[in-house]
Amino acid sequence: MASAPSCQRLAIGQPTHVGLIANMQAQKVQLPGGRWHFQHGPMDIIIGAEGDTLVLKDAHAQAWERFKGILQELVLELPVLRRPVQDTCPLHGPIAQRMWLACQPYQNSLQGGFITPMAAVAGSVAQELLQFYQAEGVHRAWINNGGDIAIHLATDASVRVGWYSNLERFNGEQLQNGISLDGQWEIRSDSPVRGVATSGWRGRSFSLGIADSVTVLANTAAQADAAATVIANAVNINDARIVRRPACEVKDDSDLGTTLVTVDVPPLPSELIQRAVSRGLACALTLRAKGLISSAALVCQNLCMTTDAVLQPILDNSLTVAACGTEYA
């Protein structure tokens, strides 16, 4: 998810907007299947959990109380969250510190670039809420923050993570009749994976690269979020046909400032795509060797690559992908 500054994961707002943010009302709606939808400003979260009814009721209540204060908590530290990660963590809140810790491994390895804690904000928020479901009586739970997912699994539990590869074909009819996924894989309780995240130029975040998507499995959602950002940035090539603009011109409160971000990628020759995705794969393999990720799937136009066989069945069925994300099946 060239030198690789962070992607901005949520447009939280300028410090001068604290009063406005404080007056915004967090909202929650119960969904079919016992799921919950929490929304507050840019945060849009789906929570699913299975287990003892009373335990789940208490977990949902605690998660909601915590959720209501998260946005203002992050806004108060936003000026520091938008600075490049340095040797010593200057942050105070638990989510902000988690963001910094997830990004810290990349501070000296981005070929002259930089990374800010904002690269891990969505996964870190999901992880913060997951703590209320890591309790006796909860069989499994997942917090999906815009496609960045934190997972809890009790002993012998598992969850299937589905892959929807082409956002261009998505329409309202699929919501009524069921979404046809391009593939799925299972995460079991004996696996260390508890986080899934996706980054790419087509998503809601900024990216320096040309990947339609990079989906990462890691030990935590925060780690997956940061790594997906870094790997997606590494899927890159210099070509005049790629449209890039300063991040501050696309969104004036971006933590990336004048860094050029990708806004359009036309169809490119296969040899250029091969070179770009190979660069991203090399980055992903390096991160896996360092223990920062478990697996990664990289997609750019008609080319898919993966770090290992865990994700290969998905990629075999998705060779004409335009964009992808993560979703529970």
How would you label these PLM feature ranges?
Residues 39-41, 209, 289-292:
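A structural signal for short secondary-structure junctions
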Residues 33-35, 44, 140, 158:
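A generic structural signal for beta-strand entry/edge sites
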Residues 115-218, 223-224:
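Glycine-rich anion/phosphate-binding loop at the beta-strand->alpha-helix junction
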